[in-house]
Amino acid sequence: MVYVLSRSVAIALTGGRRAVLRPLGVAAAALAATGYVAVVDPNAAGHYPTCPFLAITGWYCPGCGALRAVHALAHGDLMTALARNPFAVVALGYLVVAWVLWLHRTATGRPRRWLAPPWVLYSALGAILMFWVLRNVPGWTWLSPA
């Protein structure tokens, strides 16, 4: 049995100080990648590879336009980001919230919860599939990244 005298001791016992390095490392990598996308414009030809799904089928995948959306967000242009890939903008917001919760749980020594409940995962999968289909249907061109 472990007796905990204070919260700081609890963090030390659970490895909280070292464990916090993981979410901070993920944040550093995400910020570095965002910085690169902010500097190297994905709207200019030749900087990034073409989407293989788009190249093979001629249809947009759910990720098409995500780099351009991140580029626009990095420059503070929310409307352009939403025009390029609205799903990516919403997903990035969710990832930021999930990261904050991960950091908080790690810093306070609470156990990690990696998976959401099944209904959330199935709903997300359904939303991705629906977005994928609708952005390629005539009349829904406002979802295309062009």
Task: Give each language-model segment a name.
Residues 31-38, 128-136:
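Aromatic-anchored segments of alpha-helical transmembrane domains
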Residues 18-36, 82-113:
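Short Fe-S-cluster ligation motifs
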Residues 111-127:
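Interfacial loop-to-transmembrane junctions
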Residues 47-52, 81-86, 113-116, 143-146:
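Non-cytosolic membrane-interface motifs at loop->transmembrane helix junctions
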Residues 132-146:
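Juxtamembrane boundary at the C-terminal end of a transmembrane helix
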Residues 8-10, 42-49:
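Short Cys/His-rich Zn2+-coordinating modules
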Residues 45-83:
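Extracytosolic (periplasmic/ER-lumenal) interhelical loops and adjacent juxtamembrane/interface segments
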Residues 1-26:
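Polybasic, low-complexity association/targeting segments
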